[in-house]
Amino acid sequence: MSSESSQGLVTRLALIAAIGGLLFGYDSAVIAAIGTPVDIHFIAPRHLSATAAASLSGMVVVAVLVGCVTGSLLSGWIGIRFGRRGGLLMSSICFVAAGFGAALTEKLFGTGGSALQIFCFFRFLAGLGIGVVSTLTPTYIAEIAPPDKRGQMVSGQQMAIVTGALTGYIFTWLLAHFGSIDWVNASGWCWSPASEGLIGIAFLLLLLTAPDTPHWLVMKGRHSEASKILARLEPQADPNLTIQKIKAGFDKAMDKSSAGLFAFGITVVFAGVSVAAFQQLVGINAVLYYAPQMFQNLGFGADTALLQTISIGVVNFIFTMIASRVVDRFGRKPLLIWGALGMAAMMAVLGCCFWFKVGGVLPLASVLLYIAVFGMSWGPVCWVVLSEMFPSSIKGAAMPIAVTGQWLANILVNFLFKVADGSPALNQTFNHGFSYLVFAALSILGGLIVARFVPETKGRSLDEIEEMWRSQK
């Protein structure tokens, strides 16, 4: 088989796996699209107080995030027990059920009684699927990609996420222009979760054509199958020699099996969890989820909120695409460090714009530059580093812990952002700018941790990275 066809196979498998990331991003747009209709159909009929209604409305987002945490915690066991591909298949089923279930909840169960709880259950299933793909998609891609292309391919996870989000924003915009706003709020909104279910079906069908990874097959003793796949993925290499290297890594780790998660020391786990958590602690989802509110606080009209959100999605898409081209040229560590410093600068500028009530172009430019820097650094590079830095023998345990830390940081950031942004005492002084100044400080802290604890993995095989951690223990 020619090298071109082997490269085509690797690319095809990476693209199939990356659909999980597409669904990840698409669901964030679904969250934005269904907010008002859910309030109208499932909460307003209950005639609650404003505070109680707001709390109940928040359950929909919380249900997704709880599902994300649960999925990421289970993904390690699922990936080991059923394989990376098997776990992705399960996630695709979650997306299908979640999408069509949420779209049909009102028709099947009405709006009263337990209808909202049923709707939240389907949103929980969506989160479950997101939690699994956020771990197993980069793992799958890293284990089928050659070392010199691995960074670019794994960064496709973030590329897929931002593509999914942008696609969802545009789909929501098209829905709003297809009919009146009354039609969207009455029934048109159902197409947002239903479209997610359709993408889930495509994901499921394509996964049925994909094999599992050689690393997992070797782990399960299925060397013959691993050899056949390696011969297709790397026709220039000796598959038996590659299997021996993979198996040697597992065997060395088994000698330290009593140490479990910390078989290679605590530093590798701390570094991985830190990279995952700081991807959220820099404030990206506070900016993305609350962009309309942020722009209104800056003095922009509410009628431009959707277009501003799309502009953020476009910038994120463009610069994430650039990152996928340069991550293997400049390395992971420099992009993370300089990205942290760039985000810190932009958050500091934005916070000061709020603080000193500076409107116009400067705050808008700082937001878009922040998104651009994130898209070129922590957005995609986080997934590259997480997929590479953990030795194979502990990846099944360490990767879910890191991703769970990421989701917990996401919940923490969003909760505290709402508290701080609504605090009269803080706003009297900082005028909604306090949170952004905190994000600036956290960005600097994240960069310092990367500089001290995260190794450069560019150009190294997974076995070489494992040996590096073993020698440093």
Curated annotation (Swiss-Prot):
The Swiss-Prot or TrEMBL record describes its family as follows: Belongs to the major facilitator superfamily. Sugar transporter (TC 2.A.1.1) family.
Q: Which Gene3D superfamilies match?
A: MFS general substrate transporter like domains
Record's keyword terms, sorted: Cell inner membrane, Cell membrane, Membrane, Sugar transport, Transmembrane, Transmembrane helix, Transport
This chain's protein is named Glucose facilitated diffusion protein
Per the record, membrane topology reads: Multi-pass membrane protein
Respond yes or no to whether keyword Amino-acid biosynthesis is given for this record: no
Q: Which GO terms describe its molecular function?
A: carbohydrate:proton symporter activity
What GO cellular component term, any one, is given?
plasma membrane
Protein role: Allows uptake of glucose by the cell; allows growth on glucose minimal medium by E.coli cells impaired in glucose transport. Also transports fructose, but has a strong preference for glucose.
Principal subcellular localisation of the protein: membrane
Q: Tell me which parts of the chain lie in the Periplasmic compartment.
A: 35-59, 107-112, 180-187, 279-303, 357-366, 418-429
Pfam families xref list: Sugar_tr
| Membrane-traversing stretches | 14-34, 60-80, 86-106, 113-133, 159-179, 188-208, 258-278, 304-324, 336-356, 367-387, 397-417, 430-450
- Name where it's found: Cell inner membrane
Matching entries from InterPro entries are given as: MFS_dom, MFS_sugar_transport-like, MFS_Sugar_Transporters, MFS_trans_sf, Sugar/inositol_transpt, Sugar_transporter_CS, XylE-like
For whether the record's keyword set contains Membrane, the answer is yes
Residue ranges, Cytoplasmic side: 1-13, 81-85, 134-158, 209-257, 325-335, 388-396, 451-473
